[in-house]
């Protein structure tokens, strides 16, 4: 059987991994074996956190809406219930944005929610 030589492919694969590990500390950016583990783990964290990011942002929006609603004398849950009853369909992302940057509009929304309760 002829000898199989894969030096070119191995070199390319190693270069690709080391390029991905650029900026890592110590051996993680220089030694292929360590870099491969670091890059693999980083990929797992990235995959997991892309999903967690959605939950984290929703929690942030809710915290902001709750804080603004309480300044207007209403809890978060009662505000959302009131908005649903007033058939105001506005998602939490936009509602949080309004609460932070346009307090007058948010106050109007709170008043409409209070009236619908």
Curated annotation (Swiss-Prot):
This is Large ribosomal subunit protein bL20. InterPro entries: Ribosomal_bL20, RIBOSOMAL_L20_CS, Ribosomal_protein_bL20_C. Disulfide bonds: none annotated. GO terms for molecular function: rRNA binding; structural constituent of ribosome. Binds directly to 23S ribosomal RNA and is necessary for the in vitro assembly process of the 50S ribosomal subunit. It is not involved in the protein synthesizing functions of that subunit. It comes from Photobacterium profundum (strain SS9). PROSITE patterns: RIBOSOMAL_L20. GO terms for cellular component: ribonucleoprotein complex; ribosome. The gene is rplT. One of its GO terms (biological process) is ribosomal large subunit assembly. The keyword Transcription does not apply. The keyword GTP-binding does not apply. It comes from the Bacteria. Belongs to the bacterial ribosomal protein bL20 family. Keywords: Ribonucleoprotein, Ribosomal protein, RNA-binding, rRNA-binding.
